Swiss-Prot record:
Pfam families: ACCA. The lineage of its organism: Bacteria, Pseudomonadati, Thermodesulfobacteriota, Desulfuromonadia, Desulfuromonadales. It is found in: Cytoplasm. Its main location: cytoplasm. It comes from Syntrophotalea carbinolica (strain DSM 2380 / NBRC 103641 / GraBd1). The keyword DNA repair does not apply. Component of the acetyl coenzyme A carboxylase (ACC) complex. First, biotin carboxylase catalyzes the carboxylation of biotin on its carrier protein (BCCP) and then the CO(2) group is transferred by the carboxyltransferase to acetyl-CoA to form malonyl-CoA. SUPFAM superfamilies: ClpP/crotonase (SSF52096). This is Acetyl-coenzyme A carboxylase carboxyl transferase subunit alpha.
Length: 317
C-alpha cells in the first residue's frame, strides 16, 4: 500500500523521479549521471528529514500504516511459528496474536498487538485495541511458556485497550490488572519491545518485563497526544502541542533512566521503509538480552522485575 506522511512528501516525489529515470534509461539513452545525482540528493534529504523529527512527527511514524506489526516480526525474526487462539472462556481476539516459535533455534512464546493495513483488516484487528479476552489469551500463553520453561517475547503496538461497553462488561480492567500481577511473578525471562504505539494500560498489560526495549521511532505514553489535548484544551487538534509536553519518544523515555533498557535503531527513513532491516536490528537486540537473562534463576528474574518496577516509583526532589 502506497502511503506517506506530509513531511515525507519531498522525499517521495524525488524517489518517484528516480524510478521514472530508471525506467526510461536504455542503452540508447543513458541517464546514469542524472540518476547518481538524484540518488545522492535523496540520501541527503532523507538524512535531513529523519534526523530532525519533532515529537508529533515521531508519533505519526509510530502509527504509520506500513510500519512492521507483530506478524511481520514473526516472519522475519522467528521460525516455526505456531499461533494459539482463544482464551478458553469467551472467544479469540485478533487484536492480540499469541503463539510459540523459535529464536535462533531457542523455543519461545511470542505475544503482540496486531493492527491492520487496509480497512477490512483494521476492522478485523479492531485497530490493534484488545478486548479482555485478548489479554486473557496472552496470559494463557504466558502461563504455558512458564510451565515449559520458555522465554517470552512481547511486542507492544496499540493505541490502548478497547473501551467498548462489551469489553468493560467482560472485565477489561480486571484482565489488565491480572496480567500486570501475573507477569511480575513469571519464572521465565520476559523481554518486551515497544514497536509502535505504547498506549497506556493496553500496552502495560503485556509489557511487564525483565527487559523493555523501544524502537527508535516508537512512542510510549499514558495517553495519546489527541486525548491529552482534548482533556487539557478541549481541542484534539492541539495534539502536536500535547506531544511535545508528553515527551513520549524513545529518546525521552530513555532519559527517564528506569523505564526502558535500550533503544533499537531503525533503518534511515523509518522501519516502514525496510521491514527486513528493522527486524534484523530487533533480532540482534532480542538475542543479546536473552543471552544476558538465560542463566538467571527464577527468583533472580522475579526480583529483577520487581526492582525495575520499584525504580519507577522513585521521586527526585
Amino acid at each position: 500500500m502506497q502511503f506517506y506522511l506530509d513531511f515525507e512528501k519531498p522525499l517521495v516525489e524525488l524517489e518517484q523521479k528516480l524510478s521514472e529515470l530508471r525506467d526510461y534509461s536504455t542503452d540508447e539513452v543513458d541517464f546514469s549521471g542524472e540518476i547518481q545525482r538524484l540518488e545522492k540528493k535523496a540520501e541527503k534529504l532523507r538524512r535531513e528529514i529523519f534526523s530532525n523529527l519533532n515529537r508529533w512527527q515521531v508519533t505519526q511514524l509510530a502509527r504509520h500504516v506500513n510500519r512492521p506489526f507483530t506478524l511481520d516480526f514473526v516472519e522475519h525474526v522467528f521460525t516455526d511459528w505456531f499461533e494459539v487462539h482463544g482464551d478458553r472462556n469467551f472467544r479469540d481476539d485478533p487484536a492480540l496474536v499469541c503463539g510459540f516459535a523459535r529464536l535462533d533455534g531457542q523455543p519461545c512464546a511470542v505475544i503482540g498487538h496486531q493492527k491492520g493495513r487496509d480497512t477490512k483488516e483494521k476492522v478485523y484487528r479492531n485497530f490493534g485495541m484488545p478486548n479482555p479476552e485478548g489479554y486473557r489469551k496472552a496470559l494463557r500463553v504466558m502461563q504455558m511458556a512458564e510451565q515449559f520453561g520458555l522465554p517470552i517475547f512481547t511486542f507492544v503496538d496499540t493505541p490502548g485497550a478497547f473501551p467498548g461497553i462489551g469489553a468493560e462488561e467482560r472485565g477489561q480492567a480486571e484482565a489488565i490488572a491480572r496480567n500486570l500481577r501475573e507477569m511480575a511473578a513469571l519464572k521465565v525471562p520476559v523481554i518486551v519491545t515497544v514497536t509502535g504505539e505504547g498506549g497506556s494500560g493496553g500496552a502495560l498489560a503485556v509489557a511487564v518485563g525483565n527487559r523493555v526495549l523501544m524502537m527508535e521511532n516508537a512512542v510510549y505514553s499514558v495517553i495519546s497526544p489527541e486525548g491529552c489535548a482534548a482533556i487539557l484544551w478541549k481541542d484534539g487538534a492541539k495534539g502536536p502541542v500535547a506531544a511535545e509536553a508528553l515527551k513520549l519518544t524513545a529518546g525521552d523515555i530513555q532519559n527517564l533512566g528506569c523505564v526502558i533498557d535500550e533503544v533499537i535503531p531503525e533503518p534511515l527513513g523509518g522501519a516502514h521503509s525496510d521491514h527486513k532491516a528493522a527486524a534484523e536490528q530487533v533480532r540482534i537486540c532480542l538475542k543479546k538480552h536473552l543471552d544476558d537473562l538465560k542463566d538467571l534463576s527464577s527468583d533472580e528474574l522475579r526480583e529483577q522485575r520487581y526492582q525495575k518496577l520499584r525504580a519507577m516509583t522513585m521521586v527526585q526532589e
